[in-house]
C-alpha cells in the first residue's frame, strides 16, 4: 500500500511562493525571509527527487526537467521580449533616464525582430534574462542543479551498484559548497554556475531530510511548537550577521547558509503542519503550490497594477509605472503588492489548467 502523501509538504510549497512574493513586495521583514525562502525550494526539489539507476529513468527525468523548467524559462523571457515595445508604450518599461534615480532600475530601449531572435537564442543557453522575468534565475538554477545531481546519481549507481550514493553525494555537495562560497567572494557567477555550486548542497539537504524522515505526524503539539520557536529564534539570531541572496550567490559563509536553510525548513514545515489541519487554508496553499511557475513568471508584471492604481489616485509621472520591482513602499503597500502578485497569476493559470484537464480527458477516452 502506498504511503499517504504528507499534506504539509504541499502546504510548504505554497508558503514558499507566498514568501517569495512577499520578499519582493517591499515588506519590512524581507531580510528575514531572504535567510531561507529560496533555499526552501531547492530543498523541496531534493526532497522529492527520485530516480533509479536505469538509463531510461535518467532520460525521462531529463525530459521532464526540460519541459518543466527549461521551456518555461525560454518561453517566458521570449514573451517578455516580444512584448517589450508594447510595454514601453504602456510605461511598464521605460526609456526615460529619470528612472535611474530610483535604486535598482534600468532604462529599456525598443527591440527589433532581429533582437528577439538573438535574445531568444541567448535564453536557450541561460545567457541573461529580462527584468520582468527576473525571478526566473531560480528556474535556471534548479534546472542545472537537478540535472547535475541526476547525472552524478546515475554515474554512482552504475559504477558502484551495491553502495549507497548518499555519502559520495554528500561529499560532492560539500566540495561544491566550498567552491560556491569562493565564487561568491570573487563575484564569479558565469551562467549561474556559482549558484549551482552553492545550491547543490541545498538540493542534497532535501534528499537527506527525505532519507532521515520527517517528525512523526502524531508528534505532540507542544513539541512542534517548541521546534518552530527554536527555528525562529535561530533565524533571528542569524539576522544581525547578514542575509542570503542566492540570486547573486551571496551569503556570509557556508555554515551560515546551511544553518539558516535548515532552520527555515523546520519553521516552514511546522507552519505547514498547522495549515494542513485547516482545510480552506491548506487548499489555498496547495493551489498556490500548483501555480508556482505562473507566479514566478508573472508576479513582477502583476505588481504593475498596484503601481498604476497608485498613480491614478496619488498622481505622478507616467514613467514611474516602470519602477521595479515596486513603486510605493511603507504603509500597507506591501500587502497590496503581495495580493496582486499572488492572485493575478493564479487567475491567469486557471484557463490553462482547465484546458489541460479537458485535453487529457479527451485523450483518455480516445
Predicted regions, residues:
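Alpha-helical transmembrane segments and their immediate juxtamembrane cytosolic regions
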Residues: 1-366
